[in-house]
Design a protein with these regions (language model features):
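Aromatic-rich, lipid-facing transmembrane alpha helices and their immediate juxtamembrane interface loops
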Residues: 1-220
Length: 220
């Protein structure tokens, strides 16, 4: 399994990235409104894990190519797959604001991303390509439980914000131009990062009584 994950981390983005770009451009009819759908997962997957690995020491990648504890291509590994997974779930572009449709899309994408990424991280933890030092991991939990400390905010809630934000922005994005798409991309990425991170801290306080921002037991 480790060998397959090692191959996927390089081959996956090379295949899934162009497929995701083609799918979203076809979905919206041009590159400009497709940019937030393609770039927000990449930005999220660079900022959150980079801080979690090299600043807080909560995660670590055991790969040949690393910057500190972080693999420099991780944003594209997560981002390309996430954009492609979300594409068939998002629904037809909205010509006018429709909060109910946005919520339905948000829940669909959030639940699927939670399930897929929880399974992926559990396999990655079991194979050793990913290491986590969450409170559950420090207590000797297995891969699924160790990943449970962070998967809901950083995958599930991220998917809700990402998809819901895209749907709410669609009517405006249709005529906003490149500057508008850039604004939506940055604003939505910031919302995903800040809200999911705050949710992780809040959940850790509820379960463990602390922020969950200090690494637990490490291998000697």
């Amino acid at each position: 399994m480790r060998g397959a994950l090692n191959v996927y981390q390089y081959l996956g983005p090379l295949i899934l990235g162009p497929l995701a770009a083609w799918a979203w451009v076809a979905h919206y009819g041009s590159w400009v409104p497709a940019l937030p759908a393609l770039l927000v997962p990449v930005i999220h997957a660079y900022v959150v894990p980079a801080v979690g690995t090299n600043v807080l020491g909560m995660w670590e990648f055991d790969t040949q190519v690393k910057l500190g504890k972080f693999r420099p291509h991780h944003g594209f590994v997560f981002g390309s797959a996430t954009a492609l997974i979300a594409w068939p779930l998002i629904g037809a572009p909205l010509p006018a604001p429709n909060p109910a449709a946005a919520l339905a899309s948000a829940l669909r994408v959030g639940l699927v991303l939670l399930a897929v990424n929880w399974a992926y991280d559990a396999v990655a933890l079991k194979s050793g390509i990913l290491k986590v030092y969450t409170p559950a991991a420090a207590r000797g939990a297995g891969p699924w439980r160790a990943a449970a400390d962070y998967v809901v905010p950083f995958f599930g809630l991220f998917g809700v914000i990402y998809a819901g934000g895209l749907r709410l922005a669609e009517p405006w994005l249709a005529g906003a131009g490149a500057s508008g798409a850039a604004l939506v991309t940055l604003g939505l990425a910031a919302a995903c990062i800040l809200i999911s991170s705050a949710s992780y801290v809040a959940g850790s306080y509820l379960v463990y009584g602390h922020a969950g921002l200090k690494p637990g037991l490490r291998e000697s």
